[in-house]
């Protein structure tokens, strides 16, 4: 059995989106699981549409999610001489030919075919041309497709695909300026790179018969194909930017962890029993492209957030501090290591993303400027004021290094005053955080410390 070799081959005409990353992950997993090779190829032959920023963004996205490719990145724009040699070889062997049909002639032909309700296609008029070429026309090069032959391949997801060559026209492999076309360069590079398995979106399925024609014409070995169904939104429509089809790096800015995103995308179109959470090692052990679903998968923000929340909970304090560096939040330098641990232990249980975690840090560490109106209205000032004044005295005596002592101080007020828990907890929470919800009060007191806790209570009483 030959060494497995896969590739991911994006065009740098736009940023890497979520569907592209999923394809890259599938190729990466299959290669690495079989101790094979995984290559990154930048398909930049369309010089008019290429973007250096887009190419760099693809590489940046790979670095972020940790998809390591083998060897150097292959840029198609640096391989034009190789493509020219292959085109000339096909011309020399009478497997391709120059076509002098002008754009106007081709447009006129297509109009006639539309009127006759025929499929618009080239009519092979220059296929066996031996005469004098017309002046003023820069020819394209077309492949000479064998007539009335059956192209048959077994797609790893779609099953057997059969196409008669009569359904194909002699498509262009080199434009009039000499630049090669997409299907041609893809075939050349996949063959010369030794790609054994092509895993790509099923929007490429219609290209496959054309590429097989080229593989055969050039005596190249045909790889295995797996055409993955697209990702749909939750309404069953094509994924749009609003529903997740956005730049991969936007997910980092939104506070998603790479582990969660990889897990999420690997599960979009692939499954293993009822298991939802997979480490990279588990994915490498279990993934097989033959298990990919033949029907489209649905993007779910709810599922992504659920997975991200899971992975967020597994991060240590030091790991979270590193991950939070790109986000703006309150200074933490005044907190000791134990306070930091309590802050993150409490908040990561209530956060789905790093961005949300950063906001919740501010909610605890920034003293409230105003207080939640609907909670404030429910409080009886006559009862609340003496309770908080008495609690201040308890806090002055409490050991703020002992969370149990802080909890005891809270319950002492409740027991001595013979009041309901909520009757004291609500005003205390409002004084400390400015709102009616949040993490446990003993944690808040421990994290804020004695001076800040008392300061916030005094400020609340003044208001």
From Swiss-Prot:
Q: Which gene encodes it?
A: gltX2
Provide the E.C. number(s) assigned to this enzyme.
6.1.1.17
Gene Ontology MF terms: ATP binding; glutamate-tRNA ligase activity; tRNA binding; zinc ion binding
Read off the Pfam families from this record: Anticodon_2, tRNA-synt_1c
One GO location term (cellular component): cytosol
Which compartments is it annotated to reside in? Cytoplasm
Q: Which organism is it from?
A: Helicobacter acinonychis (strain Sheeba)
**What is stated as this protein's family in its record?**
Belongs to the class-I aminoacyl-tRNA synthetase family. Glutamate--tRNA ligase type 1 subfamily.
Protein's UniProt name: Glutamate--tRNA ligase 2
User: Which is a GO BP term held by this UniProt record?
Assistant: glutamyl-tRNA aminoacylation
**What does the function comment of this entry state?**
Catalyzes the attachment of glutamate to tRNA(Glu) in a two-step reaction: glutamate is first activated by ATP to form Glu-AMP and then transferred to the acceptor end of tRNA(Glu).
Keywords, ordered alphabetically: Aminoacyl-tRNA synthetase, ATP-binding, Cytoplasm, Ligase, Nucleotide-binding, Protein biosynthesis
The record's principal subcellular location, in a coarse class, is cytoplasm
């Amino acid at each position: 059995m030959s060494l497995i070799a896969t590739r991911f081959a994006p065009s740098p005409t736009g940023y890497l989106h979520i569907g592209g990353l999923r394809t890259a992950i599938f190729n990466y997993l299959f290669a690495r699981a079989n101790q094979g090779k995984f290559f990154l190829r930048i398909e930049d032959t369309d010089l008019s549409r290429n973007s250096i920023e887009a190419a760099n963004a693809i590489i940046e996205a790979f670095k972020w999610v940790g998809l390591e490719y083998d060897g150097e990145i292959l840029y198609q724009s640096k391989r034009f001489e190789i493509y020219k040699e292959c085109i000339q070889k096909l011309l020399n062997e009478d497997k391709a030919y120059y076509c002098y049909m002008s754009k106007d002639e081709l447009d006129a032909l297509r109009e006639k075919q539309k009127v006759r309700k025929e499929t618009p296609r080239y009519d092979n008029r220059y296929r066996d041309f031996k005469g004098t070429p017309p002046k003023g026309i820069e020819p394209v090069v077309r492949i000479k497709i064998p007539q009335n032959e059956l192209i048959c391949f077994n797609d790893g997801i779609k099953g057997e695909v059969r196409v008669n060559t009569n359904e194909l026209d002699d498509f262009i492999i080199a434009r009039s300026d000499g630049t090669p076309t997409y299907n041609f360069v893809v075939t050349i590079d996949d063959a010369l790179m030794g790609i054994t398995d092509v895993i790509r979106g099923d929007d490429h399925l219609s290209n496959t018969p054309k590429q097989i024609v080229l593989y055969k014409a050039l005596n190249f070995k045909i790889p295995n194909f797996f055409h993955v169904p697209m990702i749909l939104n939750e309404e069953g429509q094509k994924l749009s930017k609003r529903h997740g089809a956005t730049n991969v790096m936007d997910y980092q800015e939104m506070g998603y962890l790479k582990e969660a995103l990889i897990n999420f995308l690997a599960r979009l179109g692939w499954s293993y029993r009822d298991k939802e959470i997979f480490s990279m090692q588990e994915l490498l052990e279990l993934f097989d492209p033959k298990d990919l679903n033949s029907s489209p998968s649905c993007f779910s923000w709810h599922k992504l957030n659920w997975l991200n929340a899971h992975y967020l909970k597994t991060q240590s304090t030091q790991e979270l501090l590193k991950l939070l560096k790109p986000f703006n939040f309150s200074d933490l330098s005044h907190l000791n290591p134990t306070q930091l641990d309590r802050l993150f232990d409490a908040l990561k249980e209530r956060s789905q993303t790093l961005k949300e975690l950063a906001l919740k840090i501010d909610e605890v560490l920034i003293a409230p400027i105003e207080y939640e109106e609907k909670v404030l209205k429910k409080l009886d000032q006559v009862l609340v004021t003496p309770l908080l004044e008495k609690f201040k005295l308890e806090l002055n005596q409490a050991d703020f290094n002992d969370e149990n002592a802080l909890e005891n101080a809270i319950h002492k007020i409740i027991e001595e005053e013979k009041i309901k828990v909520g009757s004291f907890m609500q005003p205390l929470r409002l004084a400390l955080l400015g709102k009616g919800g949040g993490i446990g009060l003993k944690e808040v007191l421990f994290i804020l410390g004695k001076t800040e806790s008392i300061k916030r209570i005094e400020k609340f009483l003044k208001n």
